[in-house]
Amino acid sequence: MNLVELQDVSKNFGALKVTDAVSFAVPKGQALGIIGPNGAGKSTLFNLITGNFAPDAGRVTFLGQDVTRRPAMDRVRMGVGRSFQIPQPFEGLTVYENLAVAASFGRGRSEAAVTQDCIRILEDTELLRLANTQAGALSLLDRKRLELARAMATGPELLLLDEIAGGLTEGECQALIATIKRLHAQGMTIIWIEHVLHALTAVVERLLVLDFGRVIGIGAPDAIMASKEVREIYLGIEA
Amino acid sequence: MAYRVVTRTRTGSIAGVAAIVLIIVGFVLPAVAPRDMIQDLFTILTLLTLAQLWNLLAGYGGLVSVGQQAFVGIGAYAMFAGVILWGMDPVLAIPLGGLAALVLAVPTAFFAFRLQGAYFAIGTWVIAEVTRLLVAQWKALGGGTGTSLPREATSDIIGVEAIRSLFGVREAAARDILAYWLALTLAALTIAAIYWLLRNRLGLALAAVRDNTEAAKSVGVDARRIKWAVFLIAAFVTGLTGALIYVQTARISPDAAFSVTDWTAYVIFIVVIGGIGRLEGPILGVIVFYVLQSTLADYGAWYLLTLGLIAIAVMLFAPRGLWGLMSERTGLHLFPVQRRLLAIDPMSGQQPPKRGGPDDQ
């Protein structure tokens, strides 16, 4: 079963086609990586899936329902969780409170009902030791972890990760990959935008290449990385 | 290991008990205190209520309104209308003030919420001025020059007779005591309600919206609805406060009731120097404000200049206000709202969570 499906989705900013008739589907339990040069429209694609942008044409289906016109808030509650490219923690709240607000409002449950879930997610993302720390005082790695943890707290069926490995050192990156791998192994469906290719290929089953808003390739990572077109456009390697 | 979430602290419990004692003392105070002290306390308590509400708006809701005088004024005028036009008891007409402010808050929010930041502030101010100009056309309530509560309405306010015989005071003093008790009740209930709100899950949502509206929306918080709720609640109670202030004053004019200086600028001063975004801030702020006012009131323009300089100094050197400065140094929180995760260790009670990660830093 396809968890999320885009059919001929287009989005224009003025005369600029940022998303150009994009179609793809992600089956439940799969991890899809999205790569492409800066300005290819990757983050816009995310905003179309989360509902922050409405497409000019095409259809977005989530859990078998047409959500094209559904506002972002509804989609969070249906199970679309996202992390931001630049971590956006609630700085005045503690790490635990960041999760509590996401879990409580993302699932429409009382604070007490989500406490144990929040603790489990803190454990999974190795943030438990920082539970009572103010989010504004976290290091970059821990902010990235908090992005991931907070998205998880909303109880997502689909997890959208936007360049979550960017800016981390090699060691930190490995720690984060291990966490994401674990979540995926537990059955989480993931769409992941990333420039750090080895992080992506360590987790995802399929890669999608975006250029000028169009899908120029989708398939197994090995096949994609070997394709002439991708190497030319994305990696800038003369074939 | 099992964990539980705790908000309560020892200081918080002590502060809670102290607050209850203080409220009880406040209620019996008129038995011993002179009339001018009761009047001063009335002013302090109503300013404190207004400051707590503005703090809720700006410090928690991120809504920096410079138009709260609209709700003080409309609340006061609604109370006057109840008394003069419909022959109501002034005290019983106070709820009308809250309702009128609530009704005015709906179109105000509708327009002002389209504006962001400084534009929102100016927008609310403009709406307050427009309301003042409209109310000044209300001839039955004195138009631009204003009017007074009729003698027969103030002479038999509910409860005044009982207070007169209880304390053996004149009617005017008894009216002050009644107004003071109402102000004390309103201030205590306002602080208690805001405190409850902040400890509730709505408090978390408010903080999330204030810290990062986009991120709050992305985790399912309906930022728009929360801002509406906060704005309407603050308007309603501000309207009640306005009505109460003018029950005590018994004389109203559009310029006084819609004064941006008295009902918004001083209130912002109190919140900013006390500490924005904290319940303790306005309490400390109103005390500082009162001390400054009573020591500098005779110096005319110098008084306002001094207030301005102090506000600037606090904003530059203690952006979290005097209370912020104090609680940073001492770690003191009289009204704890932070949730803390504590491990329940079956052997030795509780201890904070400790766990080393592979990349402890």
Tell where the protein language model's regions lie, with residue ranges:
Chain A
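Glycine-rich phosphate-binding loops of nucleotide-dependent enzymes
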Residues: N2-A239
